[in-house]
């Protein structure tokens, strides 16, 4: 566990006036329990508050940036931006896991890299920033670290966004659709110049195929195509 909180504050772009808020946001229930601390010292309540703040700030930004979007399109973007998968990516980028206060059992079970645990800690951090410095500072954190993918997904579906597979997975889940299924349907060319065709399907009605020089790139392009169709038909 790292204790140089100044480095973490630099990574997130906010220096706490009251560092107790930051420490609480980083304190998992397992650590508080082992130290016999009251529930008010762990990050669960901050997570609860941060979830609401995040939802509001993301919704506010989307409505402002896309006045012509129907509710369905806005919901697709929001569902991805507040998803555990996306918040997990945010946590990894700022190195949040390295600074968490965990109980011994959680530490041994890999808590520093668990998706749900890190996503919850990001929500707690948003609440901590809000309590420390107000909603405008929380908004700056959300814009800087969470809304970066929104422009790539919403404004330019043909942009070089690299995680359409992750976005499609989360959106399918939020819409109660089957999980995307990826199938390599064709491989052509010599070993040094192989081309792959990958199909992604959601249920039996929504599918797309794409070519690429790797299975990964073909899968991402196919996921991008299905994502575009979901956006076009969302109302």
Model-derived segments and their meaning:
Residues 1-235:
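Double-stranded RNA-binding/processing signature
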